[in-house]
Amino acid sequence: MKILHISNFGDKHNGRLYWNQCYKISNGFIRNGHNVYNFSERDKSRSDLLNKFNNNKKLQSSILESVKIYHPDVVLLGHADRIHHETLEQIRSINPNIKIAEWNVDNYMLDNTEHKLKTRSKFLDGIFSTTADNKLSECLSGNFITFFPNIVDPTIEKQKIYNNT
């Protein structure tokens, strides 16, 4: 399966965020035999100064161009807050069979998470969240929402602190 993983990969930080969930998720897909293209939407947004003034127009076209070139089976979003809902609709018009899902590791009550999930839900096939709360089901819009645990990747978490307890 080909997966276009759109998230904040933090390229501007020169490896400082190597432990982020987005890398662990991509690593897991690759280890399970999938082809993953990591698209760092915040870095791409910042790379064109005009994006700041034109509502990320260049970012939206770059995402659509990536979908046309890469032909993913799945678009997976993770904290990809700069993607417009219209862009998600256009992705479906390019490939009506594509699956679009979002993962979330933020507390439901913090950082506008509830609003983000509720407004984006109708454009998604599903949502994966590390926080389980009955309020999360209010985000459903004809799709599914499910719990997934915080991810541990043995290639990243090497300290094994749990052995010290």
Predicted regions and their residues:
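Nucleotide-sugar donor-binding and catalytic loop/hinge architecture
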Residues: 1, 158-165
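Short, flexible helix-coil linker/hinge segments at the edges of structured domains or between repeats
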Residues: 145-161
